[in-house]
Amino acid sequence: MSEKNIKGIKFGILSPDEIRKMSVTAIITPDVYDEDGTPIEGSVMDPRLGVIEPGQKCPTCGNTLGNCPGHFGHIELVRPVIHVGLVKHIYEFLKATCRRCGRVKISEDEIEKYSRIYNAIKKRWPSAARRLTEYVKKTAMKAQVCPHCNEKQYKIKLEKPYNFYEERKEGVAKLTPSDIRERLEKIPDSDVEILGYDPTTSRPEWMILTVLPVPPITIRPSIMIESGIRAEDDLTHKLVDIVRINERLKESIDAGAPQLIIEDLWDLLQYHVATYFDNEIPGLPPSKHRSGRPLRTLAQRLKGKEGRFRGNLSGKRVDFSSRTVISPDPNISIDEVGVPEIIAKTLTVPERITPWNIEKLRQFVINGPDKWPGANYVIRPDGRRIDLRYVKDRKELASTLAPGYIIERHLIDGDIVLFNRQPSLHRISMMAHRVRVLKGLTFRLNLLVCPPYNADFDGDEMNLHVPQSEEAIAEAKEIMLVHKNIITPRYGGPIIGAAQDYISGAYLLTVKTTLLTKEEAQQILGVADVKIDLGEPAILAPREYYTGKQVISAFLPKDFNFHGQANVSSGPRLCKNEDCPHDSYVVIKNGILLEGVFDKKAIGNQQPESILHWLIKEYSDEYGKWLMDNLFRVFIRFVELQGFTMRLEDVSLGDDVKKEIYNEIDRAKVEVDNLIQKYKNGELEPIPGRTLEESLENYILDTLDKLRSTAGDIASKYLDPFNFAYVMARTGARGSVLNITQMAAMLGQQSVRGERIKRGYMTRTLPHFKPYDISPEARGFIYSSFRTGLKPTELFFHAAGGREGLVDTAVRTSQSGYMQRRLINALSDLRAEYDGTVRSLYGEVVQVAYGDDGVFPMYSAHGKTVDVNRIFERVVGWKA
């Protein structure tokens, strides 16, 4: 056979002659099997259509199951029927061409002119050619009289799904498929071309079916159910219906049955052919099984998430993969993934024997499939595969191994694997990790790596894939390893970084009140794989003490400079320069942390232009990995030794504080009552562009918002700055000051759709309030805190506000998912060329420079091509 390169694919419509030529037999009988259960010749299960039973030979090609591709048959339709998928095109042809002569309803000169332009541009600029044909169609459809034969044109009406009518003088007449086919046959090839179709592959009359292709048995095999009964495929059921109605129609015509009966059968044939193509046509009842289940016909096999394209071509099930629940493990590297031994023994990596690894691989073969690290298969140089489960003397087999053999060995520590969590919304939802085989049944993941996967440990499952070829392993190692993706391509900041305990530990270690003896410093540094000389202690008498800042400085590069506010720098502890008594402004000079604390702004994940960001960007991602594997463990060790716990007293306020909050509540109530009274008296000043009612709502909301923030300020003022709940909120480790306000002081206004809760009963939200009551408590304002507990009415309003959040989340997820799919489909053909432009498949320029600046965010300084301030700070030690 000669080899040829595929240059392109062209789609068209099968002509009746082509259908007959590719068919091996006509299908004429609706009966499928005889009394013995043998397929009948001439039925939809005719043996000539392909083999589905093992051991049988195909009568057509002589091949057995697996090698026989299957063969088409055909059904000669007694009367033509409309192809339901091409109704739109048929409608356009009927409207754009003359009912008498079949010409396009534009003048000969125009046809000649447009044909010339169309032929010149169709290959080079297909989108422009498409616009031209659309223009020709629209112009032709408007013509009332044919410019070629002067025939008056009647309006064509389509009644979906497939009924065409013509509005004549004498009334509305239905166009049968035969009438339509006659008209379409009259259209000359030159006119077909100018309407945007290729007459060699898509003649318009072929859209009206006279012959129906019957697909091979191989794509619609019958299956045996447990009871021994043979169950046919949905397509086979549909084809039997078509053959049965076709035969009945033929018999009725031959017997000279009344026209009404013939038309009914013709309509029924049209219905069965339409639902054979698509069983979800709007306005057409779906074809069903006896059980009431709709049949899955051709269109259903192709479209949708489970269809052929998305379900089997874009996305496939794969080998060498596993899935299980994930658990946290702060003791493994960010680059590692803990793999259960049972999975490591099931998934294999092919390793070729060389003189250097032969002894190691011999031992794996001796260990066999049940002992880790072992091997499952041996592949000989001749390609024969030996399954070690069935080898009795594995030692003997191991002794025969030689270079050239391939051993499919178990996963071992250090192997490269791909790790993924669905939904995979961006590139770093799939990254490469090194294997660390551990006891247990779950995958272990370092907590720092959760953000790119959007993973948590409340039952999430993740997928692990094992690359099989050296090329795939090398690619994963060089491009996909976790530490090479710490900086996200989304905004050029670190997506992997500290969260929760890490931030709390870093803050408690760096705060200026933390002093450590040499033993304590050694104990917390013991978890890091480093040799560090802390130098002279900061405090020499009465006892020698190191500060937490000294411990952290030991991990920083000696030429690193940084200035910036910490997360705790807000409210009464706000500092904007080095002269800060609150330790909330960070200063690092020549790698020494002189003042300030490490919190979310310094080392947190998803914090661009932070200390962590500049350390990774300026000193390599390898250094970033080392820092996270060592310094971050020190933070966790410190918080373990120090103790970090939250108790009820952390959100309990004293009586004097409560009294202060109650006074504010009384003041706000009076203010709201005054506003309501002013509204009733007509004295309220409306806000420009708002009605009086909307203005009142705005005034009330402003008053209540002020009340909640005042209550929060009062509570914060009296909370101990080392109260751990407050530490979490201020450092950015978890929660916010608002959460503490809600726990300690009050919940505040509950809203639905951005407004106070106003729906419920006819004139009030709940039966506990008077009709037309618009006071704060009657419209969802909660004066209680979580600490004191909610009243029954308050609990109801809180549930209403919470419900909206749940619904909103569910709706947003589906909408954003669909939007992303559409974006991916639209942008998938665009690429950045070597000249820096972004172009489509046809070479059309979409952007002159990628992103208008030609900068990839991952390698930018948080979006900026060059950050001059940072360069100054790095080199000189202060910002420009």
From Swiss-Prot:
Cofactor remark from the record: Binds 3 Zn(2+) per subunit.
UniProt keyword terms in alphabetical order: Cytoplasm, DNA-binding, DNA-directed RNA polymerase, Magnesium, Metal-binding, Nucleotidyltransferase, Transcription, Transferase, Zinc
Keyword Glycosyltransferase: no
InterPro entries for this protein: DNA-dir_RpoC_beta_prime, RNA_pol_asu, RNA_pol_N, RNA_pol_Rpb1_1, RNA_pol_Rpb1_3, RNA_pol_Rpb1_4, RNA_pol_Rpb1_5, RNA_pol_Rpb1_clamp_domain
UniProt GO MF annotations: DNA binding; DNA-directed RNA polymerase activity; magnesium ion binding; zinc ion binding
A GO BP annotation: DNA-templated transcription
EC code(s) of this entry: 2.7.7.6
Cell location: Cytoplasm
Description of how the protein assembles with itself and partners: (Microbial infection) Interacts with acidianus two-tailed virus protein RIP; this interaction results in the global inhibition of transcription. Part of the 13-subunit RNA polymerase complex.
Its biological purpose: DNA-dependent RNA polymerase (RNAP) catalyzes the transcription of DNA into RNA using the four ribonucleoside triphosphates as substrates. Forms the clamp head domain.
Matches recorded under HAMAP family: RNApol_arch_Rpo1N
Protein name (database record): DNA-directed RNA polymerase subunit Rpo1N
Provenance organism: Saccharolobus solfataricus (strain ATCC 35092 / DSM 1617 / JCM 11322 / P2) (Sulfolobus solfataricus)
Lineage: Archaea, Thermoproteota, Thermoprotei, Sulfolobales, Sulfolobaceae
The gene coding this protein: rpo1N
